[in-house]
A protein has these predicted regions:
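Basic nucleic-acid-binding interfaces
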Residues: 1-138
């Protein structure tokens, strides 16, 4: 496992993002998905974000991406949803007839952290740190 780093820290921060079209309208095909991904990848570097995986269904997208401790994830998601909504409606005007009040994305989204050891393993590791540890005082 390769860790990312900056001047003062090492880290590996993966996120799974799910965004749905407003009222789950079935408007995402392969071409629309490619456009949505291109917009994501264009904005992402401004927030120290890198896309690792992308997939879609007709009414939502799944994105696996890496961030950094200074990545402002919620600001990025809001900027992305705003820009991609505007661009997809411009580039695919036929979609407008399926949208409610011109809104492409639902206001909500699901963001999950991923990777590393399971939470229960980390919890147990932290709880047992002082057990049977040699005295490190000098």
């Amino acid at each position: 496992m390769k860790l990312d780093s900056n001047n003062h820290s090492v880290f590996m921060m993966h996120y799974h993002l799910i965004m749905c079209v407003k009222y789950r309208r079935n408007v995402i095909n392969d071409e629309v998905s490619a456009s949505l991904r291109a917009t994501f990848e264009k904005i992402a570097p401004d927030y120290n974000i890198v896309v690792e995986e992308w997939n879609h269904d007709q009414d939502h997208v799944h994105v696996l991406f890496r961030g950094q401790p200074n990545s402002e994830i919620s600001k990025f998601i809001n900027a992305y949803k705003s820009a991609s909504s505007r661009l997809v409606k411009r580039d695919f005007p036929e979609i407008r007839q399926y949208l409610w009040k011109e809104m492409f994305w639902s206001k909500s989204y699901c963001l999950l952290t991923t990777g590393g050891a399971p939470v229960d393993v980390i919890r147990q590791y932290i709880q047992t740190q002082s057990e049977d540890a040699p005295d490190r005082r000098r």
